[in-house]
Amino acid sequence: MAANFKEQSKKHFDLNGQSYTYYDLKAVEEQGITKVSKLPYSIRVLLESLLRQEDDFVITDDHIKALSQFGKDGNEGEVPFKPSRVILQDFTGVPAVVDLASLRKAMDDVGGDITKINPEVPVDLVIDHSVQVDSYANPEALERNMKLEFERNYERYQFLNWATKAFDNYNAVPPATGIVHQVNLEYLASVVHVRDVDGEKTAFPDTLVGTDSHTTMINGIGVLGWGVGGIEAEAGMLGQPSYFPIPEVIGVRLVNSLPQGATATDLALRVTQELRKKGVVGKFVEFFGPGVQHLPLADRATIANMAPEYGATCGFFPVDDESLKYMKLTGRSDEHIALVKEYLKQNHMFFDVEKEDPNYTDVIELDLSTVEASLSGPKRPQDLIFLSDMKSSFENSVTAPAGNQGHGLDKSEFDKKAEINFKDGSKATMKTGDIAIAAITSCTNTSNPYVMLGAGLVAKKAVEKGLKVPEYVKTSLAPGSKVVTGYLRGAGLQPYLDDLGFNLVGYGCTTCIGNSGPLLPEIEKAIADEDLLVTSVLSGNRNFEGRIHPLVKANYLASPQLVVAYALAGSVDIDLQNEPIGKGNDGEDVYLKDIWPSIKEVSDTVDSVVTPELFIEEYNNVYNNNELWNEIDVTDQPLYDFDPNSTYIQNPSFFQGLSKEPGTIVPLNGLRVMGKFGDSVTTDHISPAGAIGKDTPAGKYLQDHQVPIREFNSYGSRRGNHEVMVRGTFANIRIKNQLAPGTEGGFTTYWPTNEVMPIFDAAMKYKEDGTGLVVLAGNDYGMGSSRDWAAKGTNLLGVKTVIAQSYERIHRSNLVMMGVLPLEFKKGESADSLGLDGTEEISVNIDENVQPHDYVKVTAKKQDGDLVEFDAMVRFDSLVEMDYYRHGGILQMVLRNKLAQ
């Protein structure tokens, strides 16, 4: 029998007296299939993964041939991707680990072997999503916020700590250590692994998936990875591949270098705008060209981080000498760095700007010298605003029609003011456009010493000039690792940030994910009483409506330097390039240019204080560096003892009544429309992460279980309890359901009685009647975070199908993996164009004969008996997704497969 590709590609190389096995990409070239040098680097990484893991069952010669022919025959075929590791954060990680514990219990209930439910690849969970900014602008803020974090989340943390003892291959990085993507970049990523495989030291690329959409940040160092839903990550942990169609790869050719005044943040926002315009959803993006060598690795990581915002699966920078320089800077050993370089050169994956360019699906060019200081907002990251246009852009947005770029308000809004009487007797006035929150936050930027030290230098110059931040601005600094604190202190810049109120509040995601904490009660009252349009400026990656703070309606993304500058100005309704920020000690006007550091000032500071010793010291004891975490009392029993009275951790209902065999695909009849939504409905809208309102179904559930309102915590922190989460589905305070006109938030019309009621209440009534549900939506449905609860909650509400004009990648995949059918209107058609108003009964003519991307007949029966018929595409993107749907979900399939073994 002829050898398969795996056997043909197996080779060896020697380094420092050690022999290493590897799987040579040239094997496919030797078969005359392709020229490796013409394949994009990201495709080469996928190809190596297939060669090395070929088993003639899950991964076959056909998969390898199809991927090798990238660029020919329209990229037909699919990739069964088995990453080398998985990363989790605690909001998405808790439900993932709950599901593993639940799978174990289900396995035990039927007498199966519970040791089969164990991660088969290394899993690292970093606890970063739970810290909230309760205390700020004082030296004790870090300790106070950490203490509150542990009080609120003790049960969750006990559960995650238990898992480190119960499961193999699972580690947890404790709270107050850093943000998952920054810890991944600075410490966890090996770039090239060496593992013992059948007694041989085998070298291969580091690859991963993570339960957070910004997992993509790791592509900045040449490690291929992206965010997936928790469900897909769980399957990956249990040895299941992720299947996806062979991607298109858009090459972004970078030329020249960034000018004075422009930062990596400005470049990332510009890339986001350009690629959203281009349309790269579901595609890989790969950066190449002479401009790449002018970008420090930290800048590349900032750009790679924002791939979800530009819609790509990943934004990949192949490994080059700059990557190796960063590895040395962050304390990786010289021996390992030498191995990384040797392996990647041997296997044709080391980037050299002098080599011929690969063949990309399409190429766009970006001249770095044209990037200028910018912000994005007020409601989407792709809506770029040059700093020079910011004042006029904000003023136009106030009266522009309500939507992504407008608030739909009257000109009289500019006359509004709110008087604030502080408890200490001082007074302040807030007006339209004033800044309520200024936050240096998010791994997007805090991983980048150039922008962080740049912000410190802005603060230093501002303090020296005598500038102060207005009392109504809530300021905070939450870096993604302790290394940042080390270099800010080392440069002597932290005291200046402290003087402006940017004290350290925690190491975690904070404001970027909506954990901005409360404003002062007197400020909240003033804003609410006057219904004042106030703003936030943050160095985050998302600014969707309702995300940052319920009372802050306009949110702008900006570099840490601009966050400090706008905090000083106190308003976004200012032309920072031409109007003074304030008056200095000498009574003279101070302008932005007076406090802005030069490129040389910043790079000299970086060179002097960012050292390998800092990284080595901070990561030396990363899994045990928090005493509060170390003191948590846990058992080492392999089965979790679910407490029926817990409001944080419950055994989910996904496996209840599971049959031994999967069902068949059958038509969906008599569905009622629960929600009709427009474009750009985010996973934040579907499953919010932030505050739980006392009058919401989730709030009432918690009160019924004797949880006081002050201890509600957030939706994100309660993702281990399906009872809370199903009640929070479609409950974002800013979601607008067209079936409940005049309302905002999670309401719908229950058609049998025409009553407007909370979506959860209506869904439960439909469930009692045995009526399935449908959601109608516009373009980009499910954009934003890789939030698996957006799909899990949809399933538990009884939604059988979503019919949208288009989907964001991760959410579509999550719906299928939860047994919900994603359908797509024909191009040019929509719910509105077909005259669907949501009162109809919907039937979908689907059966066992369906294939991926087939069209099925959908019938909508009007109240007067008229029928509207249309075709919709079945968004199964691979054959295996049909299996997921048939089983009722991927976890059900995994459990059945494990039982069958």
Swiss-Prot record:
Keyword terms, alphabetized: Iron, Iron-sulfur, Lyase, Metal-binding, RNA-binding, Tricarboxylic acid cycle
Keyword NADP: no
Cofactor: binding comment: Binds 1 [4Fe-4S] cluster per subunit.
Positions contributing to [4Fe-4S] cluster binding: 443, 509, 512
Assigned EC number: 4.2.1.3, 4.2.1.99
Requisite cofactors: [4Fe-4S] cluster
Molecular function GO terms recorded: 2-methylisocitrate dehydratase activity; 4 iron, 4 sulfur cluster binding; aconitate hydratase activity; metal ion binding; mRNA 3'-UTR binding; mRNA binding
Pfam families (UniProt xref): Aconitase, Aconitase_C
Lineage top rank: taxon: Bacteria
Top-level EC class: lyase
Catalytic activity, reaction form: citrate = D-threo-isocitrate; (2S,3R)-3-hydroxybutane-1,2,3-tricarboxylate = 2-methyl-cis-aconitate + H2O
SUPFAM superfamilies: Aconitase iron-sulfur domain, LeuD/IlvD-like
Family: Belongs to the aconitase/IPM isomerase family.
Role of this protein: Involved in the catabolism of short chain fatty acids (SCFA) via the tricarboxylic acid (TCA)(acetyl degradation route) and probably the 2-methylcitrate cycle I (propionate degradation route). Catalyzes the reversible isomerization of citrate to isocitrate via cis-aconitate. Could catalyze the hydration of 2-methyl-cis-aconitate to yield (2R,3S)-2-methylisocitrate. The apo form of AcnA functions as a RNA-binding regulatory protein.
Subunit structure, interactors included: Monomer.
Official protein name in the record: Aconitate hydratase A
Gene source species: Staphylococcus aureus (strain MRSA252)
Gene: acnA
